[in-house]
């Protein structure tokens, strides 16, 4: 009898050992078979707790008939199926784990994707990236609880950055992105066959291996390889055809989109009976401002310049670029105004002051469909600028028989200005300008072989452009027709936003 009891006890203990769950693997940090998948949106402990309360595969005939148990029983052994959906329902619609990709977690604007671990818009993505890369510090003027939404996200940078961190944006993701870009550039350099500059490198400073790399390439990057890669890239990208293509596409594809910088507001000093005409002028300029930003984005190598430098370049150049277009379009008014033959009858200083009013050109053309009459300029108090654009620019362009290619090169030279205060990538922008110089010089030699001084004559128009643009800038502040928002902020928003449909242009 005792033997039977011992035999039964042995069998019972053996059965207990067989059915006893092995939890050692759950506690073993080195065992990956029980670790959650990285792509699963459900936290591991929550998923495990949900599996624990699910009915087992052998308990389908359970007496629990609640609706919740019936739904959970559809996938009894899955921690990432209906269990994941149940967990996701606990998050608000704009939470990174909610599965919604439509709202920015920081400001509520439309999200363009998942950036640095969080669904966000292009504006908040760019703001976070700049803050981390430049290691910027902000201060809140209120109580560090400012509202950050689509309308007010730019009011307090401190609270916006804190909300980025609170919503889960990762600083290390920005650094990893920069390191990835450096590795990709090195890979492209290696694939292109080493670090020597091509025959078209700017400034004649190709370096074959060692040495510091002279000319404009010096000081760019930390080594000759990256310098030469950038030199080859600039040389390969630049051509007059590429510049003209960017200009034409911006003119034809932007439609009625505008950058609302100029407006006749309540504090404007424009005379009441003239506000309508000035307002119409502001609308035309605002449309051209939008086109100008898109034109710059498609210009060779412009997209590779740091975003802050892009804003600085555009802010310094926009008035000059606008006046260059106006002067070019207004050449037709010289014939209409009696200044045919390249401006014959002008005074020795090139002005129209000595001419009778009937012979003076009467119109400036901002584009092919909008003109500005001289009488309007007189009433607005800008007749001096009106005459300077015609006498110092339009007349000289007509005498030189300036073609569209030469105009495009002059505008590119204005855009790539390395001498602006605050520019970080000075040598890179200088390299771009040198390449435009080379394109313009080659065009002059091929199209005007007998005119050795043409290249210099074209460049001599740039100081006049600069002088007139400064006078225009003074009038903008005098008449108080600028927006309350800084122009840099408007440029930055457009540069961070996706380009309009039809303007996508691959720039290596």
Swiss-Prot record:
<dbReference type="GO" id="GO:0046620">
    <property type="term" value="P:regulation of organ growth"/>
</dbReference>
<dbReference type="GO" id="GO:0005102">
    <property type="term" value="F:signaling receptor binding"/>
</dbReference>
<dbReference type="GO" id="GO:0040034">
    <property type="term" value="P:regulation of development, heterochronic"/>
</dbReference>
<dbReference type="InterPro" id="IPR001723">
    <property type="entry name" value="Nuclear_hrmn_rcpt"/>
</dbReference>
<dbReference type="GO" id="GO:0000976">
    <property type="term" value="F:transcription cis-regulatory region binding"/>
</dbReference>
<dbReference type="Pfam" id="PF00105">
    <property type="entry name" value="zf-C4"/>
</dbReference>
<keyword id="KW-0597">Phosphoprotein</keyword>
<dbReference type="GO" id="GO:0045893">
    <property type="term" value="P:positive regulation of DNA-templated transcription"/>
</dbReference>
<dbReference type="GO" id="GO:0045944">
    <property type="term" value="P:positive regulation of transcription by RNA polymerase II"/>
</dbReference>
<keyword id="KW-0804">Transcription</keyword>
<dbReference type="GO" id="GO:0008289">
    <property type="term" value="F:lipid binding"/>
</dbReference>
<dbReference type="GO" id="GO:0008270">
    <property type="term" value="F:zinc ion binding"/>
</dbReference>
<feature type="domain" description="NR LBD">
    <location>
        <begin position="239"/>
        <end position="498"/>
    </location>
</feature>
<feature type="region of interest" description="Disordered">
    <location>
        <begin position="178"/>
        <end position="228"/>
    </location>
</feature>
<dbReference type="GO" id="GO:0035075">
    <property type="term" value="P:response to ecdysone"/>
</dbReference>
<dbReference type="GO" id="GO:0048813">
    <property type="term" value="P:dendrite morphogenesis"/>
</dbReference>
<dbReference type="GO" id="GO:0046982">
    <property type="term" value="F:protein heterodimerization activity"/>
</dbReference>
<dbReference type="InterPro" id="IPR013088">
    <property type="entry name" value="Znf_NHR/GATA"/>
</dbReference>
<dbReference type="GO" id="GO:0042562">
    <property type="term" value="F:hormone binding"/>
</dbReference>
<dbReference type="GO" id="GO:0030154">
    <property type="term" value="P:cell differentiation"/>
</dbReference>
<dbReference type="GO" id="GO:0008232">
    <property type="term" value="C:activator ecdysone receptor complex"/>
</dbReference>
<comment type="function">
    <text>Receptor for ecdysone. May be an important modulator of insect metamorphosis. Plays an important part in embryonic and post-embryonic development. Binds to ecdysone response elements (ECRES) such as in the promoter region of s15 chorion gene.</text>
</comment>
<feature type="region of interest" description="Disordered">
    <location>
        <begin position="21"/>
        <end position="40"/>
    </location>
</feature>
<dbReference type="GO" id="GO:0003707">
    <property type="term" value="F:nuclear steroid receptor activity"/>
</dbReference>
<dbReference type="GO" id="GO:0016322">
    <property type="term" value="P:neuron remodeling"/>
</dbReference>
<comment type="subunit">
    <text>Heterodimer of USP and ECR. Only the heterodimer is capable of high-affinity binding to ecdysone.</text>
</comment>
<dbReference type="InterPro" id="IPR000003">
    <property type="entry name" value="Retinoid-X_rcpt/HNF4"/>
</dbReference>
<feature type="region of interest" description="Disordered">
    <location>
        <begin position="55"/>
        <end position="92"/>
    </location>
</feature>
<dbReference type="GO" id="GO:0003677">
    <property type="term" value="F:DNA binding"/>
</dbReference>
<feature type="DNA-binding region" description="Nuclear receptor">
    <location>
        <begin position="104"/>
        <end position="169"/>
    </location>
</feature>
<dbReference type="GO" id="GO:0005700">
    <property type="term" value="C:polytene chromosome"/>
</dbReference>
<keyword id="KW-0539">Nucleus</keyword>
<dbReference type="GO" id="GO:0000978">
    <property type="term" value="F:RNA polymerase II cis-regulatory region sequence-specific DNA binding"/>
</dbReference>
<feature type="zinc finger region" description="NR C4-type">
    <location>
        <begin position="140"/>
        <end position="164"/>
    </location>
</feature>
<dbReference type="GO" id="GO:0045596">
    <property type="term" value="P:negative regulation of cell differentiation"/>
</dbReference>
<dbReference type="GO" id="GO:0045892">
    <property type="term" value="P:negative regulation of DNA-templated transcription"/>
</dbReference>
<dbReference type="GO" id="GO:0006697">
    <property type="term" value="P:ecdysone biosynthetic process"/>
</dbReference>
<dbReference type="GO" id="GO:0016319">
    <property type="term" value="P:mushroom body development"/>
</dbReference>
<keyword id="KW-0479">Metal-binding</keyword>
<dbReference type="GO" id="GO:0007298">
    <property type="term" value="P:border follicle cell migration"/>
</dbReference>
<dbReference type="GO" id="GO:0035076">
    <property type="term" value="P:ecdysone receptor signaling pathway"/>
</dbReference>
<keyword id="KW-0805">Transcription regulation</keyword>
């Amino acid at each position: 009898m005792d033997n039977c009891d011992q035999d039964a006890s042995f069998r019972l203990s053996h059965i207990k050992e067989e059915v006893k769950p092995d939890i050692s693997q759950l506690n073993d940090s080195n065992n990956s078979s029980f670790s959650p998948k990285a792509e699963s949106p459900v936290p591991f402990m929550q998923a495990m707790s949900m599996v624990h309360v699910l009915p087992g595969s052998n308990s389908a005939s359970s007496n629990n008939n609640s609706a919740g148990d019936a739904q959970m029983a559809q996938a009894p052994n899955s921690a990432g199926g209906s269990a994941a959906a149940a967990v996701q329902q606990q998050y608000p619609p704009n939470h990174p784990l909610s599965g919604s990709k439509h709202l920015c977690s920081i400001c509520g604007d439309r999200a363009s994707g998942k950036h640095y671990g969080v669904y966000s818009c292009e504006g908040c993505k760019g703001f976070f990236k700049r803050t981390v890369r430049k290691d910027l510090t902000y201060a809140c003027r209120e109580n560090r609880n400012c509202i950050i939404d689509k309308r007010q996200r730019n009011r307090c940078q401190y609270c916006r950055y804190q909300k980025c961190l609170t919503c889960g944006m990762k600083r290390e993701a920005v650094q990893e992105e920069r390191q990835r870009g450096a590795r990709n550039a090195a890979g492209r350099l290696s694939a292109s066959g080493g670090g020597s500059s091509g025959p078209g490198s700017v400034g004649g400073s190709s370096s074959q291996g060692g040495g510091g790399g002279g000319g404009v390439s010096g000081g760019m990057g930390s080594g000759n390889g990256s310098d030469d890669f950038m030199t080859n890239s600039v040389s390969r990208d630049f051509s007059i055809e590429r510049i003209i293509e960017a200009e034409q596409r911006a003119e034809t594809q932007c439609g009625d989109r505008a950058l609302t910088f100029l407006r006749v507001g309540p504090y404007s000093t424009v005379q009441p009976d003239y506000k309508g005409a000035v307002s119409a002028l502001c609308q035309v300029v605002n449309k051209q401002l939008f086109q100008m930003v898109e034109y710059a984005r498609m210009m060779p190598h412009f997209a590779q310049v740091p975003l802050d430098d892009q804003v600085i370049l555009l802010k310094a150049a926009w008035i000059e670029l606008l006046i260059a277009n106006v002067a070019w379009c207004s050449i037709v008014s010289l014939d209409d105004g009696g200044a045919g033959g390249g401006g014959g009858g002008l005074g020795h200083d090139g002005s129209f002051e000595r001419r009778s009013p009937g012979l003076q050109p009467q119109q400036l053309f901002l584009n092919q469909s909008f003109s500005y009459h001289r009488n309007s300029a007189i009433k607005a108090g800008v007749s001096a600028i009106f005459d300077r654009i015609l006498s110092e620019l339009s007349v000289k362009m007509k005498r030189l028989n300036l073609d569209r290619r030469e105009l495009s090169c002059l505008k590119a030279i204005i855009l790539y200005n390395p001498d602006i205060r605050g520019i970080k990538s000075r040598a890179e922008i200088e390299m771009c300008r040198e390449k435009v110089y080379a394109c313009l010089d080659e065009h002059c030699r091929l199209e005007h072989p007998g005119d050795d001084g043409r290249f210099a004559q074209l460049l001599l128009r740039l100081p006049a452009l600069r002088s007139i643009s400064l006078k225009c800038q003074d009038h903008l502040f005098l008449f108080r027709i600028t927006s309350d928002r800084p122009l840099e902020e408007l440029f930055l928003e457009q540069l961070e936003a996706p380009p309009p449909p039809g303007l996508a242009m691959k720039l290596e």
